[in-house]
Regions:
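Structural microenvironment flanking redox-active thiols in thiol-disulfide oxidoreductases
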Residues: 106-149, 160-165
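Short, internal strand/loop/helix patches
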Residues: 141-179, 310
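Loop/turn elements at helix/coil->beta-strand transitions in domains of secreted/extracellular proteins
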Residues: 89-93, 121-125, 151-155, 173, ...
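Short, solvent-exposed loop/turn and secondary-structure capping segments
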Residues: 81-82, 106-108, 138-140, 167-169, ...
Length: 379
């Protein structure tokens, strides 16, 4: 009996040891895999120099993905297909995904223009990839007028069907993708801001390009500083009017609510909520906008911002704009507002309020039949 017990004990010890060994083996595998995974993440991110804050040359550029080709391009501005293909060879390329009625995109343009002026002769090529948000933004003439208005001289391609957008798996306006001179995507940034970081990447990649091509040049290490274009996140978010755009972001304050493709009679309630817009009059609910059909109509919006813009179109009639119930003075008037009114015709962004300082106010728009509004945006 004692022998049997002894044998059983020895057997149990062997089994426990085996289980422990197997557990240790798999734990070791898990740690090895985790270590390898972390190493891959570190390599993908690329090392940094903590002293200077500047990115260090990546040891194996082939681990970065190669940028997709520009596909499905409907038209070209400031270039031709042949010229652009030739220009892209051996260049550091910054792809800027934008659309001309997007205020966030527009606020990025001064930096792109400054970088183009500063680094184009050092090997930087900026390509504006115009991927429209609204149907009217597909019109090449509208994009050409916007490029002229904002003084854009670098190549712009019209990605009207979002084929290049999809090739990059992009989902944002604006979005920047920067490739080295071999075509690898080395940096991405979505939205506004972090301009210093983006410019440091440009400088680093230009220096790497010069070394690789045996060029005796170094990128200017100073940074573009455009304080007037710095973005403040403490403000009312962009507000959409089309029912297709309001999913999960419906800021219509009227109790009548959205009624797709119907003409709805709206009445402004007594209590107004911040960052919500309220309608008065008869408005047609469209997929990307709302259109006034009654003789008179009104939009009231309590907001927090310095600047107020609308993406709108109309028949050329004037809208009247009030700020906190009063006619807008010259101190608060936007670029498109004169004597408290603005003529609305072309599909575009209109700047109606531009105050000296950011604050909380209520803007009122009084409009006439044919006025069509897509978004409120703020700055």
């Amino acid at each position: 009996l004692r022998k049997e017990i002894k044998t059983a004990v020895i057997g149990a010890i062997i089994i426990i040891a085996a289980i422990g060994g197997i557990s240790a083996f798999f734990t070791s595998l898990d740690k090895t895999a985790q270590s390898a995974s972390n190493q891959i993440l570190l390599e993908k991110q690329g090392p940094t120099n903590n002293t200077t804050g500047k990115l260090i040359s990546y040891p194996d550029e082939n681990n970065f993905p190669v940028a997709p080709d520009l596909v499905g391009i409907a038209d070209y501005i400031n270039t031709t297909p042949q010229e652009l293909k030739s220009e892209m060879k051996d260049k550091v390329v910054l792809y800027d995904f934008w659309t001309y009625s997007c205020i966030n995109c527009i606020r990025t343009l001064p930096y792109l223009k400054a970088w183009n002026d500063k680094y184009a002769d050092k090997g930087l090529l900026i390509i504006g990839v115009h991927s429209p948000e609204f149907e009217f933004e597909k019109d090449p003439n509208n994009v050409k007028m916007a490029a002229q208005k904002y003084g854009l001289t670098y190549p712009i391609v019209l990605d009207s069907d979002h084929m290049t957008w999809d090739a990059f798996s992009n989902r944002y306006w604006p979005a920047e993708y920067i490739t080295d001179d071999l075509g690898h995507i080395r940096h991405t940034h979505f939205g506004e801001g972090e301009y210093d970081t983006t410019e440091k990447v440009i400088q680093q990649l230009l220096d790497q390009r010069a070394t690789r091509l045996g060029l005796n040049m170094t990128a200017d290490q100073t940074l573009v500083n455009l304080q007037e274009h710095q973005f403040s996140a403490i403000q009312t978010p962009e507000l959409y009017f089309g029912y297709d755009f309001m999913q999960d972001r419906n800021f219509l304050g009227n109790s009548e609510g959205l009624q797709p493709e119907k003409i709805v009679s709206y009445t402004i309630p007594s209590g107004l909520q911040n960052d919500h817009f309220y309608l008065d009059g008869q408005w047609q609910n469209l997929n990307d906008s709302m259109k006034l059909v009654s003789d008179n109509g009104k939009i009231v919006l309590p907001y927090s911002a310095k600047d107020v813009h609308i993406v709108a179109s109309g028949t050329g009639d004037n809208i009247q704009v009030l700020l906190d119930g009063n006619v807008v003075t010259s101190d608060d008037a936007g670029q498109d507002l004169k004597n408290g009114t603005a003529s609305i015709s072309d599909h575009r962004l209109y700047n109606i309020i531009s105050s000296k300082q950011q604050g909380s106010h209520t803007v009122t728009i009084i409009a006439h039949p044919g006025f069509q509004i897509y978004t409120f945006t703020f700055g």
